[in-house]
Amino acid sequence: MDYLDYFDIVDGKLLFSGGNISELSEKYGTPLIIYSRRIIERNVRELMNAFDKENFSLHYAMKANYNPAILSILRNKGVGIDAANLNEVLLALQTGFSKDKIIASPNNLPGNELKNIKETGVTINFDDISQFNMVAADPPETVSFRINPGIGKGEFEGTTTGGKGSKFGMPPEAALKAYETAIESGVHRFGIHMMTGSNVLDPEFFRESTRTFFSIASGISHKLGITFEFVDIGGGFGVPYRDNEESLDLGRTSNYIKENMKNYRDLFTENTKLIIEPGRYIVANSAVLISRVTCKKDYDRIMIGTDTGMNILIRPALYGAIHPIIPVNKFFNKKEERGDVVGPICENTDKIAKDISIQKLEPGDLIAILNAGAYVTSMSSNYNLQPKAMEILLDNREEYIIRERDELQDMLNNFIIPEHLKAIGMDRL
């Protein structure tokens, strides 16, 4: 994988999507997440072109990154939304997505939240019959259930969302009963859904999983005499994070899926829509996280201290995930060293990278952490009262702030001290 596809070097300066990283870091400070609208739109275009235009819908899994500016870019390109809960549905509506472009796929929600989602008019992929039963007295017009086809794949155990032991979806026999219950509740319009993995780079997995899923869906359709208005195969389209990984062959992947669709013509009527729900594939490589080296230790091993902690990038600590790191101002430095890249959080797990080889860095140097567009800001926190990163968007030679850096008061706004506990003269936190 060539990580430098999105970078240029002009007059010795490292540019990302046309933006001078050093200059932007000086202007806005670090940690700084820099997004490229051009890359987001190119990723959307690749997905759109890989599938037939008719009876196909691309929905973005907004859990990957819910920044409203990113959502607005996708809305303008005709992309729909895959939402995981009521707040995601409401944000999608607030950013201009019509209800018919939003599908909610919640998991283990309380009844009042499910009812509120239903009241918005968006389509719901019910994770279980128990979830549907919460609204069965007044069911939505269209009902879809999430199937666990017994197949799952993920970069890590925690990101595998199908197969044995997964908390998501229903086995085929339970799904059949769920659709029977929906019919008995007066429902006449149906969809069907699965989501089995995350960051999958092997086209063969999509071949196997969709073949199995289509077979299950076809069986339900035949046994109950129903047709599906949409068949939603979820996401899982991966991007490489390691040097030895190849990019997902999207053409081969889509051909496998379309081949399976042809083999199940009874399932895919002329009015049946295929839906995919990628998140990472659309936004991961659209952003870099810029961090500044703050200090350096060289005792039993080299520790490169930075101003980016696990509160901003949790994936390495949570999953053992790897994010490629390149030096910004030492790009041509021939001297390399091995060490850990660490942050300012009071945890020994606060390591952005372990035992990596990188050009020799000193305090004040900048590094770029790649694939920062997905599951970075959406999983960030204010642990240790550390601020989340500022975010900017590069758009047609202009730059826009799309998230301000946290100030202390921003992090304290929802806390309330009872009057009798306040310090003398204290009027606010």
Named regions from a protein language model:
Residues 1-141, 182-184, 188, 222, ...:
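A charged N-terminal "starter" segment
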Residues 2-3, 149-294, 358:
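Active-site loop/helix belt of alpha/beta enzymes
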Residues 25, 271-429:
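Charged (often Lys/Glu-rich) extended helix/loop segments that serve as interaction or gating elements
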Residues 40, 63, 85, 117, ...:
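Conserved, mostly hydrophobic/aromatic
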Residues 64-66, 87-88, 108-110, 128-130, ...:
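Active-site-proximal loop/turn and secondary-structure-junction residues that shape catalytic pockets
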Residues 74-81, 171-178, 220, 299-300:
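Structural recognition of alpha->loop->beta junctions
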Residues 80-82, 103, 123-125, 144-146, ...:
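Structured core elements
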Residues 140-152:
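Glycine-rich, aromatic-flanked loop segments that form ligand/cofactor-binding clefts
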